[in-house]
Amino acid sequence: MKIIQEIPERNIIKLIPENLDDLWHLSNIIQPYNAIYAVTERRTEDKGDKLRADRGTKRRVFLGIKAEKINFHEDFNRLRVSGKIIHAPDDIPIGSYHTIDIEPLLQVSVQKNWKKWDLARLKDAEDSSKKPKVVVVIMDDSEADIFLVREFGIKELASIKSGISKKLDYKQNEQAKFSYYSDIINSISEYEGKILFAGPGFGKNNIQNYISEKHKDLAPNVVIESANHTGKSGLSEILKSGIIDKIYGEARISKETQIIEKLLEEISKKGLAAYGIESVSNAMNYSAIDTLLLTDEYLRRNRRTIEELMNNVENINGNILIISTEHDAGKQLKALGGISALLRFPIE
């Protein structure tokens, strides 16, 4: 995320989302009644062509709308914000409806009553754009699963079978092995930065040797770690371990996974944790909340009613973490009601 300009006297921040992660951050920042300004396409009717059967022509115009609906479309790489027009050229009626499609590299101005957690989220997005992509290959001698670890979830890039079999002779298995390695390399070659290989057995070590010999340019970026499982279970193991943070710097999804693990541990021993709105609100009455945990879904559904609680947490110097339901940690928090807290001290 690029922050272009801040205009405090008007509560406006001009910014440019640079990737899908930034759009996801924006989907959690923009809320109903916020004003959004951007260059967008609007179909307008030509004054001299009212008898034509078509719906007019599209042209690019600078519009402002008051947000009513905010929809993040991962598959289409865009964030759609719909609402009534509040600023437009003279020939476009104020009060009519419009949808602004926010895509990477589109400059957007957001006008709202900025909260501390909104600004913290913008800072997170700005910092994360400077970090390399996190690519993890979980593999053994039979199969490799390749994942892109994003701010809001996991994308499986490829699942590759080795073709190695006891039914094949040595030469055929060697050919299958090198073809397997080549397919893996082709799937990760477009990503810059470190590539983490992990899994049980020696498959990860063997491909490291292959890369050192055949792809010397990639060799310095290869990191090898052990994991007891393959597939998504192996990835979950890596996320919980904190290894990704050591390699790439703090990754949001890794941080979220670890903090939910801590929450579940505290709940299991009836320790420093509260979950569900009633229990969390009670903890706030004692100023006991250290970290308030919310799923992005819960916040979007309940933002107007939950803001007082969030403000109170900030007033006692507590932390607020919004967790995506696109990955396992967020789904675990959702199962707890979508809202939980880690506490400073136990309460009855």
From Swiss-Prot:
Tell me the protein's name.
Protein pelota homolog
Per the UniProt record, which EC number(s) apply here? Answer: 3.1.-.-
Identify the domain of life. Answer: Archaea
Q: Which InterPro entries match?
A: eFR1_2_sf, eRF1_1_Pelota, eRF1_2, eRF1_3, Pelota/DOM34_N, Pelota_arc, Ribosomal_eL30-like_sf, Transl-rel_pelota
- Gene designation per UniProt: pelA
**Biological processes per GO annotation:** nonfunctional rRNA decay; nuclear-transcribed mRNA catabolic process, no-go decay; nuclear-transcribed mRNA catabolic process, non-stop decay; ribosome disassembly; RNA surveillance
Describe the family membership recorded for this protein in Swiss-Prot or TrEMBL. Answer: Belongs to the eukaryotic release factor 1 family. Pelota subfamily.
Whom does it interact with, and what assembly results?
A: Monomer.
Q: Which UniProt keywords apply?
A: Cytoplasm, Endonuclease, Hydrolase, Metal-binding, Nuclease
Q: Does the keyword Metal-binding apply?
A: yes
- How are the domains described in the entry? The N-terminal domain has the RNA-binding Sm fold. It harbors the endoribonuclease activity.
- What subcellular compartments does it reside in? Cytoplasm
